[in-house]
Amino acid sequence: MPNLDRLPGCALAILTALAAFLVLAAAPARAADDAPEHEDWTARFQSTYIMQKKPGFTARYSGANSLLTTREQSYTLSATAHFGVRAWDGGELYFNPEMALGEPLSNLTGLGGYYNGEITRAGGSNPTFYRQRLFLRQTWNLGGEREHIDADLNRMAGFVDRNHVVLTVGNFSTLDIFDDNAYAKDPRTQFMNWGNMTYAAYDYAADARGFGWGFAAEWYRADGWVFRIGRMTGPREPNMLPTDPRIGKHYGDQIEIERAHEIGGQPGKVRVLGWRNRAVTASFRDALDYLRANPGGDPQTILKVRNGEKIKYGIGLNVEQAIDENLGVFLRAMKADGRTETYAFTEVDGSLSLGGALKGAAWGRAQDTFGVALLRNTLSPDRRAYLAAGGISFFIGDGALNYRPERIAEAYYSLELLKNTTLTLNAQHFANPAYNADRGPVNIFGMRLHTEF
């Protein structure tokens, strides 16, 4: 029998992915017409394999946290079970165990907008098993016309009043509740770049995998308005995995207002999100002062000046609009204050993304999707000055900085292979990687295999 421990990580991931896809694809799929109107329990599964390659590129210089100029390959594999039960009237309990493995490009350094929304789950070439989610969702109906909720991952089919309140408590992701978008949200099925799964400047509180403990309340109104508020735990140390449980002391707060509308008979939504974090982090001005006072020392001086609790905040706009039944467009824009180091997401202080997704009905492939997006990421003056002086941050630091906004173009084509199974080709182009005009441009090409049932 072969020794799997001796297989290279990528080879083991491919073998595991193929086995998972064969099992999942062979499982009987329920036809849409057979979908139940009401469920008292749910058991669903997903598996996603992503492989990406980066050709070599040129750079005038490199630093400790630069993207490597040599050719590289990255991969991730995740497999998740989504279990749920309707425990009482309006009460739903969900549990998601997950397995993940993978290896990033350049040890996950050298970019602002990263290339794979799954990469934070990858902890190396050996499979890691962990609890991804464990939460309670309680719904209170407030009267009015009834509407049907379709079954999905972590969602059971049923009926609710159009006017209702939802409380979610437990272990989940901020992005499970906030900043939804029909065309740019899920890196397992849509765009892969971090700046297309949420605002790149949204430094939302979470552990290194993107999850935490907390609560969120949502009020859905019959007139199309939705109001959301929530608080989540963050990491004990910025960007690390262990969670800080002191949710009354260190936390991330967010509030979001959503309005549904129609333009030309086509649906759309507008969302405004504000957030505020409180945690022990370093300010870039303190880090720059320390760097200048200690020439020749460790340039990652943010680690030396985490000397007190800081506040970080931002505000963003999220728009989605259907053009017709096959084409939709989106826009996200956010500005953060940028005075302190990254708490839990990535090195972006201002972000803009816009794009669209087109279903393949026009060429006889109704279940296929083609998407294209443009992104622009910027840094605050404080972070920019620190990096230009030779400072090293958590994800970026070239030793110098010829500052320009980081610009990204992303395109994908998702091809339905079997029911509930898709193969996606993805391409991303990065100009001024990590905001440095002296490096790049960089291209990353990817393939994704995804199935769920």
Label every PLM stretch briefly:
Residues 32-41, 55-56, 84-93, 141-164, ...:
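Short loop/turn motifs that connect adjacent beta-strands in outer-membrane beta-barrel proteins
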Residues 41, 75-81, 130-136, 165, ...:
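Hydrophobic, lipid-facing positions within transmembrane beta-strands of outer-membrane proteins
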Residues 43, 47-51, 95-99, 167-171, ...:
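Transmembrane beta-barrel strands of outer-membrane/channel proteins
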Residues 85-87, 97, 138-140, 171, ...:
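Residue-level signature of outer-membrane beta-barrel architecture
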Residues 110-126, 130, 145-252, 256, ...:
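Surface-exposed coil loops of outer-membrane beta-barrel proteins
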Residues 132-145, 372, 441-453:
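Outer-membrane beta-barrel "beta-signal"
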Residues 194-319, 324-329, 333-340, 347, ...:
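Signature for the C-terminal beta-barrel architecture of outer-membrane proteins
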Residues 258, 273-309, 330, 337, ...:
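Outer membrane beta-barrel transmembrane domains
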